[in-house]
Amino acid sequence: MKFSDYLDVHPDVEEAIKNGEPIVALESTIISHGMPYPKNIETAMMVEETVRSNKAVPATIAIINGRLKVGLTHEEIEFLATNDEVRKVSRRDLAITVSQKHSGSTTVAATMIIAKLAEIAVFATGGIGGVHRGAEKTLDISADLEELANTNVCVVCAGAKAILDIGLTLEYLETKGVPVIGYKTTELPAFYSSESGFDVDYKIDSALEIAEILKTKWSLGVDGGVLVTNPIPVGYELESSIMNEAINQAIIEAEKEHITGKKITPFLLSKVSEITEGK
């Protein structure tokens, strides 16, 4: 069997691919593991509408009953938002979830893999996974980083998730040869905040110039992704002191409850949201 035998591309996305229209891949973990219902489905629909309003076609990616879905119907988004048995799927889980015909929401890594199969080059998400705090003891490093090193997809986000060790995450990306671009910024944003205290590799002020960089990189045969960081607007960001206090409190609670592995990121993000009252 070919990979296309496992792939279901939404007609709108298929038409856009055929016509060479701009397409933005979107992940689905936020729907099933990132937010409570109904905020999860409202956010998913709002993100898709934002893509459409900027004259591109959204392609939310997930796995439903063992099928790789590129572009979801409203009913499929509702299913992901309300079904407790939906798995969180990264690279290691992909083949098993498909083979056993289960349903799963895709992490950054899994979304990149499926986007590449569908020949979609740009993927937007809130923030990437990375090196967790305390990784020198736990070796807890997200598969997102390895995927960025190997898969030819540009990931646009608001930086690494603030719950991570951002300095070590940047070191890992440097080791793997992943360019970190700041869109109109010299500083790496930190998800909830426009500031992290760490510099990006390159500040680029034009989307067209970024597109030229992508085209050149892959034409040269230099495989791997590119991370484009676009800071959260200042009016929506959390003050660093509030953010760090909430994260530290969430980490303490995770340790008390012995939360580890793939459960740690959704737990911390949910706890930070709870502590900051959804800010």
Segments predicted by a language model, with ranges:
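A C-terminal functional module that forms or caps the active site or interfaces directly
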Residues: 217, 222-279
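Solvent-exposed alpha-helices and their adjacent loops that cap or buttress functional pockets
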Residues: 14-18, 23-24, 53, 113-117, ...
